[in-house]
Amino acid sequence: MRRSAFILALLAATALGASNAAAQEITLKFSHFLGPKSFFQLDVVEPWAKELEAKTNGRVKVETFDGTSTVGGVTDQASNVKAGKVDIALGLRGAEGDKFLGSSVIELPFLVPNALRGSQALWALYKDGTLGEEYKDYKVLALFVHNPGLIHTKDKRILEPADMKGVRFRSPNNTVSAALRHLGAEPVLLQVNDVMAAVKDGKIDGIVTNWGNPLQGFNDFMKLHIETQFYTSAFFIVMNKQTYESLPTDVRAAIDSISGEPWVAKFGPYWDKWDKPVRDGANAPGHEVIVPHAGRMERWREALKPVTDQYLEELAKKFPGARAAYDKLAATLRQ
């Protein structure tokens, strides 16, 4: 009898030990499309991973995969999450084809004043249901945008919209490409890693991008900088919904506590920090930062208004709430 009781106790202890060990063996895979020393890796992914590990007392580990990995393709981040190749991914909306089209309204010209307000406005649009079901297959951890993108050229001085005619620009997404074509410029879509080679080879004359960009040697070639609020880019951080729902309740609560609105609010300070070195570099001799006066800025707005109207009209064929989403964003960001 004692022997049986001892064996049962031993088995119970073994099972409990195995259960506790299993509870500590949660590893989440988190990917993004930039390099291992990029600001996304060092300031976004790694701190969040460490915070989650701390909040779960070490039960959850996060394994990170950057853009040099087999799951680091810029066009594949959301697909990899949905397919279960990774559990979490940070991706660029404009690289995802027809995914998340409703979110593209925030990328239109002269809408976003800065990364903080733009990110919070996009997150609010998601939370209140305006974006419909475009993220229904995912657990959304954050949505954010960068500070307004501007026009940079090697030597072409651009003051008025008419000055854009015939100039070849690297464009970051289709929204910007439509604006460039409307102004008579020639948009060229290039992956991040190919941009500076195209500049050096004379294949493009300028770049439309924000200050805090991952382009190495950017200020060595781009000498003129025209500060128009030409566009912004939307980004997402999403998690595999099945993975999230399979996690213990306390782990889900830990993820929720460091995601959503608190995480979104960090991207304003993040982008200000990431912008500063490049913006400061543009103060060096040989550079000129051109800030259009109010009258000139209004001419830019008027020149690009038809682009916004046409884009929303086309977008409505796939995302019926396009105009309503844009109007809500515009009203929010005017406040």
Segments from the language model and where they lie:
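Short linear motifs centered on Gly/Pro in flexible linkers and helix caps
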Residues: A13-L16, R323
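Cleavable N-terminal signal peptides
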Residues: A9-L11, A21
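N-terminal secretory/targeting leader peptides
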Residues: Q24-R117, Y126, E133-Q335
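Conserved Rossmann-like nucleotide-binding pocket used by diverse enzymes
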Residues: R2, G17, K29
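Bacterial N-terminal signal peptides that target proteins for export
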Residues: M1-L8
